[in-house]
Amino acid sequence: MGQKINPIGLRLGINRTWDSRWYAGKAEYGRLLHEDVKIRELLHKELKQAAVARIVIERPHKKCRVTIHSARPGVVIGKKGADIDKLRKRVADITSSDVVLNIVEIRKPELDATLVAESIAQQLERRVAFRRAMKRAVQSAMRLGAEGIRINCSGRLGGAEIARMEWYREGRVPLHTLRADVDYGVATAFTTFGTCGVKVWIFKGEILEHDPMAQDKRQAGDDSRPRRDAA
């Protein structure tokens, strides 16, 4: 059943960690959870052009620390930091805590599954041939060091009368192997023929040590962890 489950949820606590990192009692939990949802909705809406892959929310004592992982940090920050100041104020309106906004640059967006899926979805909306978009994404990921990649596109592809699912894979993508560093992303293309779903799995090697923070270290450019190359 490894193919049915979300690869990120399956690996939480092994080589992935949660995007909301805080603890609250019963009285506060519901309110804070709703705040997280509203903050993420706001940021994804305001930063559509900033290639945002992840939003991590931490809540140290009486603070709300929001870390935005983006391939275009300049778009988030704006001229002389004007845009990020506006964002901070809007996030502060949602939560009663002091807000701290951090930006983390994604240096290789071609290896981030969420960004790859969104890129393909945008190309489908511009009527680029889906096979060409998939093949281009696969070649870019493999060229930059991915061990394997799989892309699924489903819906009325190319305006076909009957919806179908097409997929393309290169290398190996071991979904059952818990130590495998598998990134997963989903996006939806809103075309004139209806919606098309895009799913992307990217395998980046195996992590041999138990490290729930492995993903954060990878995005920060820390490749010091032991890793076994795929055979």
UniProtKB/Swiss-Prot annotation:
A GO biological-process term: translation
Superkingdom of this protein's organism: Bacteria
PROSITE patterns assigned: KH_TYPE_2, RIBOSOMAL_S3
GO cellular component terms given for this protein: cytosolic small ribosomal subunit
InterPro entries hit by this protein: KH_dom, KH_dom-like_a/b, KH_dom_type_2, KH_sf_prok-type, Ribosomal_S3_C_sf, Ribosomal_uS3_bac-typ, Ribosomal_uS3_C, Ribosomal_uS3_CS
Location of the KH type-2 domain: 39-107
Keyword Ribonucleoprotein: yes
SMART domains on file: KH
GO molecular function, one term: mRNA binding
KW Nucleus (keyword) present: no
Keyword terms: Ribonucleoprotein, Ribosomal protein, RNA-binding, rRNA-binding
Family statement drawn from the similarity comment of this UniProt entry: Belongs to the universal ribosomal protein uS3 family.
Subunit structure, as described in the record: Part of the 30S ribosomal subunit. Forms a tight complex with proteins S10 and S14.
PANTHER family: 30S/40S RIBOSOMAL PROTEIN S3, SMALL RIBOSOMAL SUBUNIT PROTEIN US3C
Function of the molecule: Binds the lower part of the 30S subunit head. Binds mRNA in the 70S ribosome, positioning it for translation.
UniProt-recorded name of the protein: Small ribosomal subunit protein uS3
